[in-house]
């Protein structure tokens, strides 16, 4: 597991009717905070190398830009909603499992959600390690430059692309044997990945 001391795991509780952040929760190293004060979150983000949230790119990033002085080019954003969808495709849904709520109408606890987000990232890293190297290679090639995914590849072992280029025929055979009934395979991989 990576050293999470420079990871800011966070969640925002935002009211779209009032267009205000009700509160936020975050974990940065040994610091666990649930607050409303923008300065604390901004300070924590300035110390972080990674910002990790569940649906961070579509939901939280616009709010962070609007209400806080947090600029994403300065940190790497990991989106556990996107990672969960990719790495656990058989799950019927990818919402955080908020078992701490006694009633569906209870307000979410952003600090508890930050803890859940951290656990989910740990699960994603573990799941990645269980994938065959061929699938790791394909996912890396397709997603290495995609927001929300690209920072993930700094946390996990990725097959050495230089060595694997020599094994492209083996990757093509593996992919065909595992996915030929699921998708159209009339594409020549050899020409695409040179």
What do these predicted ranges mean?
Residues 1-194:
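DEDD superfamily 3′-5′ metal-dependent exonuclease/proofreading module
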């Amino acid at each position: 597991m990576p050293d999470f001391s420079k990871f800011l795991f966070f969640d925002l509780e935002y009211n779209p009717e009032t267009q205000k952040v009700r509160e936020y929760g975050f974990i940065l190293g040994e610091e666990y905070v649930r607050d409303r004060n923008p300065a604390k979150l901004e300070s924590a983000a300035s110390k972080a190398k990674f910002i990790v949230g569940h649906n961070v790119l579509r939901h939280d990033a616009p709010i962070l830009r609007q209400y806080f002085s947090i600029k994403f080019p300065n940190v790497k954003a990991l989106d556990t909603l996107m990672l969960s969808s990719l790495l656990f495709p058989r799950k019927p849904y990818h919402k955080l499992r908020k078992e701490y709520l006694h009633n569906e109408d209870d307000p979410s606890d952003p600090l508890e959600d930050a803890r859940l987000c951290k656990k989910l990232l740990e699960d994603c890293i573990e799941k990645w390690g269980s994938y065959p190297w061929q699938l790791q290679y394909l996912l890396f090639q397709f997603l290495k430059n995609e927001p929300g995914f690209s920072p993930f590849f700094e946390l996990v072992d990725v097959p050495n692309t230089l060595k694997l280029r020599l094994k492209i025929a083996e990757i093509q055979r593996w992919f065909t044997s595992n996915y030929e009934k699921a998708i159209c395979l009339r594409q020549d991989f050899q020409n695409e990945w040179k």
